[in-house]
Amino acid sequence: MNPFISLQNTFDPKPFSIYMLSLLFLMQFAACSNENGSVVENKPAEQLSEEEEVQKPGIGTARDISSFDLVAEMGVGWNLGNSFDVESKDKTYWGNPITSKAMIDEVKAMGFSTLRIPITWGPNQVEMSPYTIDPDYLTEIKRVVDFGFQNKMHVIIDVHHDNSWIKPMTSETQKSTDRLSSLWTQVANFFQDYNDSLIFEILNEPRIEGITEEWSGGNSEGRGYINDFHKAAVDAIRATGGNNEKRHIMITTWAASTVPIAMEELTIPNDDEKIIISLHSYFPWQFAGEAAVTWGSESDKSALIAELDKIKQNWIIERDRPVILGEWGTIEANPLQSRINYADFYVKEAAARGLLTIVWDDGGNFRLLNRNDLSWDFADIATAIVAASQ
């Protein structure tokens, strides 16, 4: 989404006097302290309570399940937009507060069970080889990923507003590929022990900015380079091993477009079995993004159904690949009841076709949640989304 359209458990052994303890006590009741300083009994991992498990979110074995099965269990989603995707080291630069656990708790309490975290890496990555990412930035991202895991959510992390250096054009493609491969190698290594509830999304709306075809499917050369970017990134992720050998990965078309030529020319890297298709559909944009037209007539509904049918036909039926509609939504300038009706219809019809929806919330014109006081500015829309997904 273009923002300008809208706005350890550290092991802290307690010292104690050995002479006060019997050998049997030492063998059977060794203890460690939690972060609050209280003593808890050591247990095998499989015996940890839900409360104790939350201290090591994400750690676990990646299941060997299909991407269709994963998408089916994920549940309707919410975007943490205009936060980590800010094109600045200051992640409050676009007006949203630093993400708190209470914020993600509130999203889960509303009924959302998938958290997409859009991330812009450029300001926190060295521009020259080996393209090192600031380790503090990775740690900050991990903090929010863990908030999602602590809420038993699936979490998606991506490469978002990095089009300034990811350029699908001949003069830039080699450096773009090298830097993107390095980025995903570092990210995959950092999150290697996280289970399959963490999903990697290679690119967000990849395109050449400013060209005539920017939002209409792109050009043949650019679409080909995007395929190359995906393959390089998937190869980099898989090469890190561990859970990343089975990590589910999302790839997308030119600009995440549903234009037929963009979908037709997207190729699956290595015919990898754990690839999910990511698309964005603010349909129709004149209503969803501009509030220039009304929505709700039978012809409006038929047109939206045709859009969703086109996506299902291309990917689920013809190419046997699951789809996540990673961004959709409506701006607040539209009449509230129209937005509620649209959300209900959109999510219900998408779900009926096996398409998972993740609503765009930027904290601005597309906002649902007020991130400052954690109240829902548009609770009726959020409620409609959750209800329609069930």
Walk through the language-model features, giving the residues of each.
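Acidic/histidine-rich helix-loop elements
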Residues: L80-T99, E127-I133, E172, Q286-L304
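Active-site region of glycoside hydrolase catalytic domains
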Residues: D178-V293, D300, A306-I331, A352-L355
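Substrate-binding cleft of secreted/luminal carbohydrate-active enzymes
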Residues: I305-D377
